């Protein structure tokens, strides 16, 4: 288990016509690594009443990419959101340490699959002039399936989004420095067709929620 890291990121909706622009020369961005394409497959869990989602907590088991395993995303902070990671284990049985971390919220309540989110991601690391990683820029092509029992079961939603996440070089310094970097990147992305996200997270969108 990791003790948890704070992720600072912004997401944007884009349509099929949008093309990711070059960000070299924006703020401190001096170079870009070759894009890395991979597939992610995540199953999200909650109580049937969505106790975790209502508390703005997300629990998933994700395969693929560079951080496969169980993840808990905690409620947003003033800046960013803390995420804990656990080993993937075998199958979809929720590990004891994940249950223990959630005990205050759900006790021994039954946790069931509520959504599956598959994502073809094309990720590019942006670096400063010293080679330090500033940002991971992700072009996500998402297919989400609602797994809840009831009339929405099996509902499939597809969309594309761009995600900007600060890496160690971009996270250093003051909050104002981080905001300035993200704002500069956002200006370039908006000019290329990026729009504010229609939902607060991939899970919310998968479930047809706005938060």
Question: What do these predicted ranges mean?
Answer:
Residues 1-211:
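Phosphate-end processing signature that detects enzymes handling 5′-triphosphorylated RNA
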């Amino acid at each position: 288990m990791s003790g948890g890291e704070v992720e600072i990121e912004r997401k944007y909706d884009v349509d099929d016509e949008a093309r990711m622009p070059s960000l070299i020369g924006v703020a401190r961005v001096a170079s870009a690594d070759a894009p890395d394409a991979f597939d992610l497959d995540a199953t999200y869990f909650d109580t049937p009443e969505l106790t975790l989602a209502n508390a703005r907590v997300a629990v998933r088991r994700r395969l693929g990419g560079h951080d496969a395993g169980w993840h808990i995303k905690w409620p947003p902070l003033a800046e960013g959101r803390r995420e804990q990671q656990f080993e993937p284990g075998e199958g979809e049985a929720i590990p004891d340490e994940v249950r223990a971390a959630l005990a205050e919220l759900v006790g021994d309540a039954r946790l069931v699959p509520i959504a599956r989110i598959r994502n073809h991601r094309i990720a590019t690391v942006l670096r400063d002039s010293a080679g330090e990683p500033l940002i991971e820029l992700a072009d996500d092509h998402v297919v989400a399936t609602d797994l809840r029992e009831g009339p929405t079961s099996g509902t499939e939603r597809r969309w594309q989004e761009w995600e900007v996440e600060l890496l160690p070089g971009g996270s250093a310094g003051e909050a104002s420095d981080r905001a300035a970097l993200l704002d500069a990147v956002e200006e370039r992305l908006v000019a290329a067709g990026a729009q504010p996200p229609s939902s607060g997270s991939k899970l919310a969108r998968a479930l047809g929620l706005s938060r």
